[in-house]
Amino acid sequence: MLNSRHGLDAMPVVDSLLFCSPAREDASRFMLATVGELGLPAIRMRMEETFQGVPMLCVSAQATDAEKLASLRHGFAGPGILVLEDLDLWGAPVIDAADDMVGFFMAAMSRGAREAVNLIRQAVENPDVYVLASASSLEAIDPFFTELLFPLTCVDIDYPTAEERADIWMDIARDHPSIRSVSRDELVRLSANLPRYDIYMAAREAIEEAYKQGLVERRYIPVSRENLFDKLAAYQPLDSAEYAELERLVVSDFSASLGDLNDLVG
């Protein structure tokens, strides 16, 4: 009905979505969560380096989607998702002249690269296909790709708020009981200005250290305050107020433990 009312042959092209965050991992997580919510067959593209340092475009898909994406060389046959990971790490040749140079550029590309560019272009032009990309910022992306993804909507993802950090630490504590003895209020305050990914990584490193220490001593050792604060400090900028406080608390806890040891020896 909308097509006839508006006098269009088909639904307009859906904007490509670019998830941007100073922490590239956070942008990727939000993008992949969106992929999960959509529940459509998805193909992922990302740039990696070979052992020789040569950039290489890697294309992958879930095994369950293989049959639906078998004819992908000819474009999406139905609804789907094209995921472009860390687009700011992709490089493209500089093209000064627009129309006459594009043909020369495409001819010079390898067959695989041409197919990848054509697939992206077909996905952008297909209203049944969602194109999702992640990057640290829009400005960090090569203009070749921003033009290729037009129309493009940028979704800015900032660092987590205090409320979000509280939810993150609650989520970590639910999965890892050994961390529950550390004050959540302190963790929320001292993890300010950290990306979500760094918070999870700091917690995981502290949990793994406590686990290994328990294996050595042959007993259960929960995650200590000193252990977790030390891991958080490793992710905080050296000139931040949070780093200074974490450093002070770690030294204070260490000094207190030495005092307890002296009392036992004495």
PLM feature segments, named:
Residues 1-185:
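Walker A/P-loop NTP-binding motif of AAA+ ATPase domains
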Residues 2-11, 25-30, 218-266:
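C-terminal engagement/docking regions of AAA+ P-loop ATPases
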Residues 49, 138, 183, 205, ...:
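Residue-level signal for alpha-helical context at structural boundaries
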Residues 63, 160, 182, 194, ...:
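Short coil/turn linker and secondary-structure boundary residues
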Residues 128, 177, 181, 199, ...:
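Residue-level signal for secondary-structure boundary elements
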Residues 178-179, 200-205, 251:
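A general structural signal for short secondary-structure boundary/capping elements
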Residues 189-226, 230-238:
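AAA+ ATPase "lid" subdomain C-terminal helix
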